């Protein structure tokens, strides 16, 4: 079992921390690849995105807030990421005794066209469909993303 530590800065951004955010999101990319490579050997890898009082957060928040963010309030969630029947490829957000799952998802999207029909204006005309979050898909591997692109292509050429 492997657990990497990502960060809300990597998942969502934070002013002045581009290098840190890039490194922390890079761990999510590594996790997504290793979950595929390790599956045949029952190697499971997950990520925790903790909100906890650390040396990095000292002085940024009042003591009464930091008291609610003890690192041990993240630990029970991490324990679930390493148990025998643990998931793999999960991003667990954890802090102050609260837990949620974060995911990278993609909207249904739209086929816009090819050749002369494919213009910035055509993409703009389809923007509402491209950015519609009412239908979202979580891909388990990069190949699934490619399959989705070709499904949009096929549907677009039919209609």
Model feature map: region roles:
Residues 41, 49-59:
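Short, flexible catalytic-loop segment of classical short-chain dehydrogenase/reductase
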Residues 10-12, 54:
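Conserved catalytic-site region of short-chain dehydrogenase/reductase
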Residues 28, 35-48, 86-94:
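Conserved Rossmann-fold SDR core element
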Residues 12-19:
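Active-site loop immediately N-terminal to the catalytic Tyr-X3-Lys motif
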Residues 18, 26-29, 73:
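Conserved cofactor-binding/catalytic machinery of classical short-chain dehydrogenase/reductase
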Residues 65-157:
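C-terminal helical subdomain
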Residues 7:
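Residue(s) in the substrate-gating loop at a strand-loop-helix junction
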Residues 23:
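Active-site helix of classical SDR
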């Amino acid at each position: 079992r492997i657990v990497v530590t990502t960060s809300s800065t990597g998942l969502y951004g934070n002013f002045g921390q581009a290098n840190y955010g890039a490194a922390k999101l890079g761990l999510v990319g590594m996790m997504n690849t290793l979950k595929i490579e390790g599956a045949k050997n029952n190697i499971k890898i997950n990520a925790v995105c903790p909100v906890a009082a650390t040396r990095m957060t000292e002085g940024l928040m009042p003591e009464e807030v930091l008291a609610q963010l003890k690192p041990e309030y993240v630990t029970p969630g991490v324990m679930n990421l390493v148990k025998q029947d643990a998931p793999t490829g999960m991003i667990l957000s954890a802090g102050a005794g609260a837990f949620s799952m974060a995911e990278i998802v993609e909207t249904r999207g739209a086929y816009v066209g090819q050749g002369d029909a494919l213009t910035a204006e055509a993409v703009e005309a389809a923007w509402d469909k491209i950015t519609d979050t009412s239908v979202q898909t979580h891909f388990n591997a990069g190949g699934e993303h490619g399959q989705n692109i070709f499904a949009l292509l096929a549907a677009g050429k039919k209609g």
